[in-house]
Amino acid sequence: MRSYKPYIIKLCIVFLCFWGWILTSYAQKVGANDYFYVLNTQQGLSDNCILQMMQLADGRLAVRTPKGINLYDGRRFSLIPLPAEKAESITKYKGQTHLYADSQDRLWVKEYQKIFCILLAEGRLLEHPLDDLPGNGKEDKMKMMRNGPARNAIQDLFVDSRKNVWVVMGDSLLNTQDGNQIHLKKEWGCLQDLDTDGKQVYAFMDSGIVAVFQKDKLAYTTSAYSAAEAQHYRNTSLTVQTPSGQFYQIRTGRDEKNKTDASIFLHFNPETRKYSRIFACDYILHTLNMSSDNQALISCQHGYLMFDFKLGTTPREVKELALPDGKSLTTGINTVYRDKEGAIWLGTYHDGLIY
């Protein structure tokens, strides 16, 4: 009797080879164990220039492109346009694109001296959002500051890790949820980042100083470096708090003496009240994502950097990515994000999303 086993085995091999070819045409290898896929305008993204992204509480990915906010649910994109004329002015913010999600299910899109607000539940842009602040019965304090002798306008806005909205008005920092008001001293410089651990409020200034408050009282200040070195890193700041309460920060600026860009990656430990330097370079670091106290991802002009602090502070540099069409991407990675499932997302200037 004729055996069909050899033919079945051959068919299985052909079948597996076929599907292997199909899958590898979409998944490309980045490093030893890294594979990625590409999402761009062909998959419904409004445009291929990614300015910033973050994962929302419901699992969706919010992606800022020049045309607006693209919300990705794992299957398709939906676009919420952000017309320039609908932006509100925040004169003290001079950084890059930053996304915040607050406790009222609003997404704040902060850019150089302007801000947008999206009502996520309704999927629409909220007009004049600063006029609606604050909520929870705190209008009197806000009105007093706006209508008082100084007639302070809202000049900047932050959302902390507890999803509270804070606004800067003159030399005051106001929590719009509970009315806590903090005085910022002029000699500290300009506020660039803010966060809280539930007990203390941390105000990160462009001078490298962090001012720490309990309620509205100053607890202490400390600095990341000397006043002379601070001149190199005044331009931008991005601070991330880990679940254990540690702070990691990238700062950028310009080294005028050497005529180069300047960036530094820092760790601030609230328990010791001290800063430590992790990494410095003569090019611009873009975005920072921390998956734990032991691992960090930073996007930069040359690709992205992967830090594993268990192995030291020297990063693994990923400078070249092989795209599905056979081309290589060597520059143009603007932002990096690790989602709740551990997947790494890369936002590029010209090639959409890579994950």
What is the role of each PLM region?
Residues 1-355:
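Carboxylate-rich, polar loop motifs that coordinate divalent cations or form catalytic acidic clusters
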